[in-house]
Amino acid sequence: MRFATCDLCDAHKNDLSGDFRVLPPVFRDFGGRPAFAGPVAVVKCHEDNSLVKDAVDSPGQGRVLVVDGGGSLRRALVGGNLAAAAARNGWAGLVVDGCVRDVAELRACDVGIRALAAMPLPTEKRQQGQRDVPVWIQGVLVQPGDWLYADEDGIVLSRRPLHG
């Protein structure tokens, strides 16, 4: 699928319905795919990546996993093992409102990864969190089933597919 977030923004800049949204430019690129898109699945967790692991171990089917880590910079929610699982299981990308680790390994994975920062400290494993719930990422509503488009210029969301 070919797209450019700038073109999507040009086409939808007057959409005041809330169906088209743009995440703030705070996410860094860590993955092996500079551009990715797909329907959204959601994990909400705080410094515990147990549900992230469960998600990426399941078939991704071209989806994008949005991880609401509350913007925490204290623990890494995704590392090399989880990124490799995401690539192996067909996830298009991961957007983490939090940290990642194993940066060289992430870059080698064929999956898009955006996150706030790198942090070498791993998470706790308490099986806490929620899946497939609406979340607020950096002040922007993200819902399961939204479409997410990410490239070098940014990340946009829509309630419906915008490509094709």
Predicted regions span which residues?
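Mixed-charge, glycine-accented linear interaction segment located at domain edges/termini
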Residues: 143, 147-158
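Feature captures the catalytic cores and cofactor-binding loops of soluble hydro-lyases/lyases
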Residues: 1-144, 161-164
